Amino acid sequence: MNKEKAIVVFSGGQDSTTCLFWAKKKYEEVIAVSFDYNQKHKLELDCAKDICKKYNVEHHILDLNLLNQLAPNSLTRQDITVDKSAPKEGVPNSFVDGRNLLFLSFVAVFAKQKGVNTIITGVSQSDFSGYPDCRAVFIKSLNVTLDLAMDYEFEIITPLMWINKAETWKMAYDLGVLDIVKEETLTCYNGIKADGCGECPACKLRKKGYLEFEKQFMC
């Protein structure tokens, strides 16, 4: 298994950017892979491109526009408004069915062609917002499936799986990239960089985590 190279599933948001810099500390060569799935806000991809260019990371964008046809949701459809809070039943309408499954599967194919075994993704079960494809059991089962499907040994690493948003901010701080993550990333479901709109679930979670980070670790 090649332990010197890693591929990061990279959206340009808080979590994946933290994982990108975590990977840069641990591996000699890091490649970032982003996806164009016809998301409303192309600024997400612009952020990803800008970060990779600025910090000298090889970057690839894969076309996954078909996902928008298969799974209508508030992140890809202009006529669907993002839920401001989680529903009492079911998943938020910002959940894209199959997104992490497809992202990781496509990245695995890409990784094998590059001779890379390690795939890093920023999913977290602690702050998973009700998304079933952010759970550890899903990642573990998919890892086994990909190994069997391609007769190749993958290692899917999830640095954020068991930490909350405050601890994710702390990780960025420890890596020396707190300002980069705070100012140069896009987490907002309404496509606003840095602090975002402040109203969507992603912005609320990000802000809550930052305030808890300041209270717990910076006092």
Curated annotation (Swiss-Prot):
One of its GO terms (biological process) is queuosine biosynthetic process. ATP binds at F10, S11, G12, G13, Q14, D15, S16, T17, T18, C19, L20. Keywords: ATP-binding, Ligase, Metal-binding, Nucleotide-binding, Queuosine biosynthesis, Zinc. It is an enzyme of class 6 (ligase). InterPro entries: QueC, Rossmann-like_a/b/a_fold. It catalyses: 7-carboxy-7-deazaguanine + NH4(+) + ATP = 7-cyano-7-deazaguanine + ADP + phosphate + H2O + H(+). Pathway: Purine metabolism; 7-cyano-7-deazaguanine biosynthesis. Binds 1 zinc ion per subunit. The keyword Nucleotidyltransferase does not apply. One of its GO terms (molecular function) is ATP binding. Its cofactor is Zn(2+). Its EC number is 6.3.4.20. It holds the Pfam family QueC. Zn(2+) binds at C188, C197, C200, C203. Catalyzes the ATP-dependent conversion of 7-carboxy-7-deazaguanine (CDG) to 7-cyano-7-deazaguanine (preQ(0)). NCBIfam families: 7-cyano-7-deazaguanine synthase QueC. Homodimer. Belongs to the QueC family. This is 7-cyano-7-deazaguanine synthase.
